[in-house]
């Protein structure tokens, strides 16, 4: 039986180089699968044609934009998904969806192997391979860029040597990954932590200091899901796309961070995620008024753990599924409207309303009509601090 390798194909350097290598290594055929996740830029048909030009026997494009938004980005909104309290999981969210479609393609097209173009330094090798092991353990996995020690400069030289149709060159050695949820840039001069990002590095966002007029927006949620913008019904994908445009025009969603990679190293990453950051901020603000205090406190820890599970490539794992169930159970009352102002790179919440709100004006007000019984406070304060008071007394006397 002929070996048939199903390759996750992005159209970039690593996976373009992988096609001729995989054909040679396995003495087989390569089926390239490209997933449209709303990354924009190059036409997906051009990507498909490039895969064929690089030697793939078949090249398949899957339009997964709505699926990505509804089944992967929406859970991230509900979980306020920010790894290390900053990174909105731009790449991490897309990997399990790519795994799913590669496995389906392998089943439909007689695939014996699956392959990716990830290096041995990154997180994506883990995300792909753990996903394959969880969902299709019989498929053999090949990672040519990692297992054959391809450095970026060697890959560029090889691509030029055999005239592979890719745009990357030694003078522009960035690694870029993007989808509708955001854009990630690494390597190149960014590896020196003292070098600031240059203006031409950004594509999803304008300079925050351009002086554009503030943009006020109202985002409506039902059960934690964004359902309308300024009163207009939208799908999750449409909400992300519109906030990408409007937030990006205001320079919202830029992030320059050093993150702790799963493989144990620290890596500098520059991200743009205007839609993700606006929707997560709005969702957090709505939870502030609709989720009870102790549940909200506990959920913050669950949100952080959920983000770590996704970042670590454990999308299909039992713990991740259980965290999903808990988070979904907290969203029943997360319904209402949040008004925000987007301006000069900032997201400012300035209005909140919900029929499910736990905010009681009569209890919160300091004016006439206050219904809060302050006579209860003295005893509450005494009991609340009693344990600490006793311990501190002991420590003073030692």
From Swiss-Prot:
Q: Does the keyword Cytoplasm apply?
A: yes
Query: What cellular-component terms does GO give this entry?
Result: cytoplasm
Q: Which CDD domains match?
A: ASS
Q: Name one Pfam family in it.
A: Arginosuc_synth
Q: Localized where? A: Cytoplasm
**Predominant location of this chain?**
cytoplasm
Q: Where does ATP bind?
A: 8-16, 117
The record's listing under InterPro entries reads:
Arginosuc_syn_C, Arginosuc_syn_N, Arginosuc_synth, Arginosuc_synth_CS, Arginosuc_synth_type_1_subfam, AS_cat/multimer_dom_body, Rossmann-like_a/b/a_fold
Among PROSITE patterns, the record links this protein to:
ARGININOSUCCIN_SYN_1, ARGININOSUCCIN_SYN_2
Q: Which GO terms describe its molecular function?
A: argininosuccinate synthase activity; ATP binding
Q: How does it assemble?
A: Homotetramer.
NCBIfam families given in the database record: argG, PRK00509.1
Q: What is this protein called?
A: Argininosuccinate synthase
What species does this protein belong to?
Answer: Corynebacterium kroppenstedtii (strain DSM 44385 / JCM 11950 / CIP 105744 / CCUG 35717)
């Amino acid at each position: 039986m002929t070996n048939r390798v199903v390759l996750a194909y992005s159209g970039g350097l690593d996976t373009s180089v992988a096609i001729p290598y995989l054909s040679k290594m396995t003495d087989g055929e390569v089926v390239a699968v490209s997933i449209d996740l709303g990354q924009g830029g190059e036409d997906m048909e051009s990507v498909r044609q490039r895969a064929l030009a690089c030697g793939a026997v078949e090249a398949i494009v899957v339009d997964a934009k709505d699926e990505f938004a509804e089944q992967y980005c929406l859970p991230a909104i509900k979980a306020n998904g920010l790894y290390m309290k900053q990174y909105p999981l731009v790449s991490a969210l897309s990997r399990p969806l790519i795994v799913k479609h590669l496995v389906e393609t392998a089943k439909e097209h007689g695939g014996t192997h699956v392959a990716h173009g990830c290096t041995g330094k990154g997180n994506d090798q883990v995300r792909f391979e753990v996903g394959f092991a969880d969902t299709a353990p019989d498929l053999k996995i090949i990672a040519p860029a990692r297992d054959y020690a391809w450095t970026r400069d060697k890959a560029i030289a090889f691509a030029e040597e055999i005239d592979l149709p890719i745009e990357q060159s030694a003078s522009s050695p960035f690694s870029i990954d993007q989808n509708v949820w955001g854009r990630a840039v690494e390597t190149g001069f960014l590896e020196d932590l003292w070098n600031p990002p240059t203006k031409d590095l950004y594509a999803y966002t304008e300079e925050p200091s351009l002086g554009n007029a503030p943009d006020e927006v109202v985002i409506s949620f039902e059960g934690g899901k964004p359902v309308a913008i300024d009163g207009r019904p939208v799908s999750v994908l449409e909400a992300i796309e519109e906030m990408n445009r409007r937030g990006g025009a205001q320079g919202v969603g830029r992030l320059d961070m050093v993150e702790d990679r799963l493989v144990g190293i620290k890596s500098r990453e520059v991200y743009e995620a205007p839609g993700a950051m606006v929707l997560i901020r709005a969702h957090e603000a709505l939870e502030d008024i609709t989720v009870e205090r102790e549940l909200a406190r506990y959920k913050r820890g669950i949100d952080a753990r959920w983000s770590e599970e996704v970042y670590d490539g454990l999308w299909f794992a039992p713990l991740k599924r259980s965290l999903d169930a808990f988070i979904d159970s907290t969203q029943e009352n997360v319904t209402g409207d949040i008004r925000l102002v987007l301006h000069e790179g900032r997201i400012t919440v300035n209005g909140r309303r919900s029929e499910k709100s736990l905010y009681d004006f009569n209890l919160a007000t300091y004016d006439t009509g206050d219904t809060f019984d302050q006579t209860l406070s003295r005893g509450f304060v005494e009991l609340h601090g009693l344990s600490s008071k006793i311990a501190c007394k002991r420590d003073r006397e030692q």
